[in-house]
Amino acid sequence: MKKVRKAIIPAAGLGTRFLPATKAMPKEMLPIVDKPTIQYIIEEAVEAGIEDIIIVTGKSKRAIEDHFDYSPELERNLEEKGKTELLEKVKKASNLADIHYIRQKEPKGLGHAVWCARNFIGDEPFAVLLGDDIVQAETPGLRQLMDEYEKTLSSIIGVQQVPEEETHRYGIIDPLTSEGRRYQVKNFVEKPPKGTAPSNLAILGRYVFTPEIFMYLEEQQVGAGGEIQLTDAIQKLNEIQRVFAYDFEGKRYDVGEKLGFITTTLEFAMQDKELRDQLVPFMEGLLNKEEI
């Protein structure tokens, strides 16, 4: 059995929801407290046991490469000033994993971004992690999916329940049977119109695939939104081999839109005791202001 050693992180999107902030800075580099969002994703992959990561980038994404590269001048400056704690944080970002980069030359959708990394993956099972979803869990969300892959030797799609009124925002599974938290799936539906979703189990940014998925991504079939959708390829893969969904444990934070990004930042800040002690009285004072 081949183990899951490699992961793809698509990071080529334009980040239009965060304009003008993302005009020159990648959305993936927007910080949650003191770390860019993409670092949380990579840390989860590493904790799950991933050895090699390929980040699929686009134009104006050089800052991602710089962040995970070595910075001798900065490290020397911090060392000379005795800022050891900051130095360790900087070194950690540079030593997380073997990280590689490939460019998606045209914004053709998530399925196309994954397809761009096919030569890096080869004939191996692999993971995909989306940068809009940060997961906090006792066992990393991706590790839970990798464990299920080792039991089934099948592709595993990470899902969680979402409110019914939000199902139109996600890929949704139509479950056939279930065993514990694992579902055999009849259909995968990309962003169903309101009121038509077959369930409220939404695909939430964590996947483990067999390499056969590339056969269907190779077809470059245009789907919803005029893009090459990963969900469409998953549906086709499910016709020739079992594809399971797994309701992974943990709290998922949606940092792909402004409100979710702000609330995640606040919640993560509150998890830091020093920041919490300062934030609580500030927020209480803010909420008590009559003009708000």
UniProtKB/Swiss-Prot annotation:
One of its GO terms (cellular component) is membrane raft. Interacts with FloT. It comes from Bacillus subtilis (strain 168). Its main location: membrane. The lineage of its organism: Bacteria, Bacillati, Bacillota, Bacilli, Bacillales. Belongs to the UDPGP type 2 family. Its EC number is 2.7.7.9. It is found in: Cell membrane; Membrane raft. Disruption phenotype: Under aerobic growth condition, deletion mutants display morphological defects and the cells are curled and show some bulges. No aberrant morphology is observed for the deletion mutants under anaerobic growth conditions. Pathway: Glycolipid metabolism; diglucosyl-diacylglycerol biosynthesis. It is an enzyme of class 2 (transferase). GtaB is the main UGPase enzyme producing UDP-glucose under both aerobic and anaerobic fermentative growth conditions. YngB augments UDP-glucose production under anaerobic growth conditions. One of its GO terms (biological process) is UDP-alpha-D-glucose metabolic process. One of its GO terms (molecular function) is UTP:glucose-1-phosphate uridylyltransferase activity. InterPro entries: GalU_uridylyltTrfase_bac/arc, NTP_transferase_dom, Nucleotide-diphossugar_trans. It is a peripheral membrane protein. This is UTP--glucose-1-phosphate uridylyltransferase.
